Amino acid sequence: MTNDSARMRKVLTFTRRSNRMTACQKRDYQHLASRWIIPYQNTVFDYAAVFCSPAAPSAPAGAFPAPQGKTDAVAPACAPAPLVVEIGFGMGSATAAIAARNPHLSYLGIEVYRAGIGRLLRKIEAERLHNLRIIEHDALDVLRTMIAPQTLAGLHIFFPDPWPKTRHHKRRLLYRPRTDLLARALAPGGYLYAVTDWAEYARRAQEELARTPSLTWAPQGARPWRPATEFERKAQTQGRAIHELFFIKA
């Protein structure tokens, strides 16, 4: 490990926000965490075994009635589906929408904000999203220890903290050598899709990603399959432009 890499491991890329939750979010977290959250571990986890197995029931009977046309049947037997990771899903609305539209893919959302986790847990349970799981931990630790190199079909990083002050730029997620770790996790042909409303961050992130070995910029604008996030709608209401960055692993 280089000295720069060692220093980076000690710097958090996220703000420690309050874990205050509503009563509903607390209930959902208490009842559903064991069903849909994968505990953090210091070894590579077998994602195929997780996603190809049924989630053990843990919610009170009748608390989350199945939506029309869906049942609480076990997840079907399956071959390992391509795995897509989202770092920092916020309140999880876009995450759930993407997973619902792509049942042939496996999705893993990584977040430390417990209120958002509670809300996404409810969406997963209510919509029976067997192809979506959560890890509650620092995403960089997860990528270092739980995700084997060249595993991921995609990485979603939607509206990461821009850390606008110059002295805080070293905390940015899209900053080398952190981007090297992101690229390492991607399988050949996998993609990294980042979105921000901070123009200076978009420019610098594009430069950092372009300098990252094995990543190639694929500029095509917004992907039509990405739903708008709550943060994005707020940014657009305030007149801020949205910047899309899409890179492919060679």
From Swiss-Prot:
PROSITE patterns attached to this UniProt entry: SAM_MT_TRMB (PS51625)
An annotated Gene Ontology molecular function: tRNA (guanine(46)-N7)-methyltransferase activity
EC number: 2.1.1.33
Keywords tagged on the record: Methyltransferase, S-adenosyl-L-methionine, Transferase, tRNA processing
Disulfide bridge map: none
Listed Pfam families: Methyltransf_4
Catalytic activity: guanosine(46) in tRNA + S-adenosyl-L-methionine = N(7)-methylguanosine(46) in tRNA + S-adenosyl-L-homocysteine
Positions contributing to substrate binding: K165, D197, T229, E230, F231, E232
Tagged with keyword Coiled coil: no
Gene3D superfamilies: Vaccinia Virus protein VP39
Alphabetical list of PANTHER family matching this protein: 3-DEOXY-D-MANNO-OCTULOSONIC-ACID TRANSFERASE/TRNA GUANINE-N 7 - -METHYLTRANSFERASE, PENTACOTRIPEPTIDE-REPEAT REGION OF PRORP DOMAIN-CONTAINING PROTEIN
Role noted for this protein: Catalyzes the formation of N(7)-methylguanine at position 46 (m7G46) in tRNA.
Protein name per UniProt: tRNA (guanine-N(7)-)-methyltransferase
Organism name: Treponema pallidum (strain Nichols)
